[in-house]
A protein has these predicted regions:
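ATP-dependent helicase/translocase motor core
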Residues: 2-309
Length: 310
């Protein structure tokens, strides 16, 4: 019991940090089930698309179609959808003779506009008859953007390795717990308080510890403590940018990749320089992901500064 209480304290401390003024997250203790999660998503979707819906709520059949569209076969498929069109992620609903193009997320509205940032914990991932050998699970902390869980966090106390969190996530994926709206998760975070890592979402058979990355600050110093990690990576706009700007689709292997800290810092430095009209270059050693860095740097600059000559 003492260990369980300790981990609940760890969880609360993280939520408190995420919801402090500068982080922009709102804690939603009222969302614990799949039904509550879908209801919350529906409310946000309707609020952000009032004009297109003509203030008429989505019907049961319309929303059933949306729920089906958001229930992906893989995290990679979710990633393809989340790329969107010119920074906007849509769902499409047929209403009479008209097709409504509803904006789920606008990645041009990071840290403002129509973006809604919420934190949930102890989500109940229930047992399903289709999941042989499975049982009910409770997720630690999940971060929702416009009602969709995009980042999931598993926490351990100091008596455990962060790898226990990694293995736990792998087990949950194998059991099919990341289904429905949770199939949209793009990034996982695991921590034992003093050692914190992140990695891209993948099938359980594709999760490999070699893709786990720690965070480094701009001075190349490791950020290990989970609260320090939350301050550096999980506040807004950083968390939204991790899934919207620094996640890459590997279309050959059909999997997600998330940039490593040095790649992200390089892209951010180039972005800041471009805003000031300065030039420069990114230097990477052999095998450090130059192609991926250059691709994401170019894509992000085009999104930030539309006037750049393509």
């Amino acid at each position: 019991m003492a260990m369980a209480e300790l981990e609940s304290v760890i969880e609360k401390r993280l939520i408190d940090q995420l919801c402090c003024d500068e982080s922009q997250w709102t804690y939603r203790p009222d969302i614990r089930t799949e039904e509550q999660l879908w209801d919350n998503f529906k409310y946000i979707l309707e609020q952000n698309n009032k004009a297109k819906l003509n203030d008429i709520p989505l019907s049961e059949s319309e929303f059933a179609k949306i729920k089906n569209d958001l229930s992906h076969a893989s995290f990679y498929d979710a990633g393809k959808w989340l790329i969107g069109e010119n920074g906007r992620v849509y769902v499409h609903v047929q209403r009479g003779n008209e097709t409504l193009h509803l904006v789920v997320m606008n990645n041009e509205h990071i840290a403002g506009g129509t973006s809604v940032y919420e934190v949930i914990n102890q989500y109940q991932a229930f047992y399903s008859k289709e999941e042989e050998g499975s049982r009910d699970r409770r997720f630690d902390v999940s971060l929702l953007i416009n009602g969709i869980p995009l980042i999931h966090i598993e926490l351990k106390n100091k008596e455990h390795s962060y790898m226990d969190g990694f293995r736990q996530i792998k087990k949950y994926i194998a059991e099919g717990k990341f289904h429905g709206i949770f199939s949209n998760v793009q990034m996982f975070v695991v921590s034992n308080v003093v050692d914190t890592k992140y990695f891209a979402a993948a099938r359980d058979t594709e999760l490999n510890k070699k893709f786990i990355s720690g965070w480094l600050d701009k001075e190349n110093l490791p950020v290990c403590d989970y609260i320090d990690f939350a301050k550096a990576v999980l506040k807004i706009p950083e968390a939204h940018e991790m899934v919207a700007k620094y996640t890459v689709l590997d279309n050959d292997k059909k999997k997600l990749l998330i940039l490593r800290p040095y790649q992200i810092h390089a892209i951010e430095a180039m972005r800041e320089a471009s805003k000031k009209g300065k030039s420069g270059f990114i230097w990477h050693t052999t095998g450090s992901g130059k192609t991926m860095t250059s691709y994401k740097a170019t894509r992000n600059l085009l999104m930030d500064i539309p006037s750049i000559d393509k």
